[in-house]
Swiss-Prot record:
Ligand binding (substrate): 12-13, 158
UniProt keyword Magnesium present: yes
Domain of life assignment: Bacteria
Residues involved in Mg(2+) binding: 159
Quaternary assembly: Homooctamer. Dimer of tetramers.
Compartment annotation: Cytoplasm
Record-given protein name: Isopentenyl-diphosphate delta-isomerase
Length: 358
């Protein structure tokens, strides 16, 4: 029985990658297209003046983007993790691994995650567990990678669509609180593409969480992935569940939103999307599907070249926004229009204030 469970988990990991890459060819809107930065025609800064440094889970890092939780747990995904770690090392950005549950249950799969630290011995690496994993195993996951931080992914919608998924969730909050109190490294709580509302963030802040990844809709859709894995595809009606990355970011502009650090991910397609997310308060921006699709299509070297180009393009966008650094970018005026503006108004967000920031 254990062997069958292990094989099922390995197959699921491989299916997640294959279906995620396929999805990246036709992504849903992230709502970031409804956000327009108000730039300048007379920049105050030169490109060389721009400082992209940001704070990432207590560490100072040179660039405001990272490789988000992706994969691990099978022979095939070991190679992918090695290549992602090489990209992270060469581009000097943090990286999160995918859920380590497979390795915690089957020690023969530990190397499919540890390869990340072997390839990138000095980089910032995030371990990854579900709230289903107890504290002792969570610490094992951290030690497995000599991780610098721990990502706890919350994914009730995915679990409900997954035939073999969890059906009990009421203990998650107390488990997350225990992690916050006992983890030897910083903790970030992350959605998996369904977005966090300000109410969810407030609930997490009340138990001591200091950083969240809003992880909105617009990137990899795990409800669709799990539905596609089902023979009956019985959850077609749930494929649009959740809030977009743009909606999650706008929701955090409410006066009552908790004042904690947040990251943004979900449908980030280009440097302009990164800048928009940073302007709406994110400290850094995560990408998963975009990077793995580039890796599959173009290989490691071309993906590194692409991300190095993004750094230079980010500096140019900061110049256009008249912002020398991320702190100044967060004061740049921006217009919210279209469906996102309607949504923001119903959520009582002061869109006029955003449009007239100084």
């Amino acid at each position: 029985m254990q062997k069958n469970d292990d094989l099922l988990r390995e197959r699921r990991k491989d299916e997640h990658v294959a279906l995620g890459v396929k999805q990246n060819e036709n992504l849903a809107p992230s709502s970031l297209e409804d956000i327009q930065l108000i730039g300048t025609s007379i920049p105050r800064y030169n490109v060389k003046d721009i400082d992209l440094t940001t704070t990432f889970l207590g560490a100072t890092v040179p660039f405001p983007f990272y490789i988000n939780a992706m994969t691990g747990g099978s022979r095939h995904t070991k190679r992918i993790n090695a290549e992602l770690a090489e990209i992270a090392r060469e581009v000097a950005i943090p990286m999160a691994v995918g859920s380590q549950s497979a390795a915690l249950k089957n020690s023969s799969l530990i190397d499919t995650y540890q390869v990340v630290r072997e390839v990138n011995p000095k980089g910032i690496i995030l371990a990854n567990v579900s709230p289903e994993v107890d504290i002792q195993d969570g610490i094992r996951a951290i030690e497995m990678l000599e991780a610098d931080a721990l990502q706890i992914h919350i994914n009730p919608a995915q679990e409900l669509v997954m035939q073999e998924g969890d059906r009990s969730f009421s203990h998650w909050l107390s488990r997350i609180e225990a992690y916050v109190k006992n983890s030897p490294v910083p903790v970030v709580v992350k959605e998996v593409g369904f977005g966090m509302t300000r109410e969810t963030v407030k609930t997490l802040a009340e138990i001591g969480v200091t950083t969240v990844d809003l992880a909105g809709k617009g990137g990899t859709n795990f409800a669709q992935i799990e539905n596609d894995r089902r023979r009956d595809q019985a959850y077609n009606f749930l494929l649009d569940w959740g809030i977009s990355t743009g909606q999650a970011l706008i929701d955090m502009q409410h006066a009552d939103a908790p004042k904690i650090a947040y990251l943004a991910s979900g449908g980030i397609r280009n440097p302009l999307d990164i800048v928009k997310a940073l302007a709406l308060g994110a400290d850094s921006v995560g990408m998963a599907g975009q990077i793995i699709s580039s890796l599959k299509k173009d290989g490691v070297s071309k993906t590194i070249e692409k991300l190095e180009l993004w750094k230079e393009q980010l500096r140019g966008l900061f110049v256009l926004a008249n912002a020398k650094n991320i702190a100044e970018l967060k004061e740049t005026p921006l217009i919210v229009s279209g469906e996102l503006a309607k949504w923001g108004s119903l959520r009582e967000i002061d869109l006029v204030q955003l449009a007239n920031r100084k």
